[in-house]
Amino acid sequence: TYLGQKVRIMHEGNVVYGAVRNHGSLNKKELEITDIIIDIGAVSREDAMGHVACGDPVSFDTDYRELLNDRLCARGLDDRLGGYIILEAAKKAKERGCTCGIYAATTVGEELTKHGAAWCASRIAPTLAVVLDVTYTSDYEGTRAIENGEILLGGGPVFLHNSFSHKMVVERLEKAARNIHIKYQWENGCGRTCTDADAIHMAGRGIPTTVMSIPLRYMHNPAEVCSMEDVQGCIDVLAEFLCGIGSDICLKPLEG
């Protein structure tokens, strides 16, 4: 199938990399030529035509690739990005003299049982938890912001507001972003997050938990696309957040 595949475009002796867009609605119909659209990271028609032209040959590509405008195309960005951000943020926080104890974990079973996160949280019993995952963008053809909210690639880290997401932890993340002038986005929900946060927040006696997400195009496909600006924003915000936590932290809504 063409959908979700990484491709190489040969243009005037140079190679331009891209991804064939995919969306759930396309799996319900017989494909037409107009359904096959290639994303090269361009932000406008003029930007795209400066790098490719009609008639350029296209072939499949199997490696990770850097796209235009500091964007990355690869498989498994969900959730390798989360693991990378956690480690880089912890390292940066340590370099800045962070005094709180930090446990960084990459756990198994998130897509099925979430047992890895549940066991880890129960054993550590942290004061709070921030889960790093990815979220769907709504900025390409076939998506509808009116249904799922407006999430933009390059729009910054995404903070979650829902019944599983601890309000005071979210507010601290938002404050951290404002402190270092990092733009951010929101997404809302009313139930499960479909991330490890669903298990962590119920572990032990209950753990104040939230999710910080990286905007991602074409999730669960061989050619996922992210913005490295968003990735760096998540690293910086998480490091700032960690440096702002002291032993006197209070997350009780009526006392903090």
Feature roles, as predicted:
Residues 1-256:
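N-terminal hydrophobic/helix-forming segments and targeting peptides
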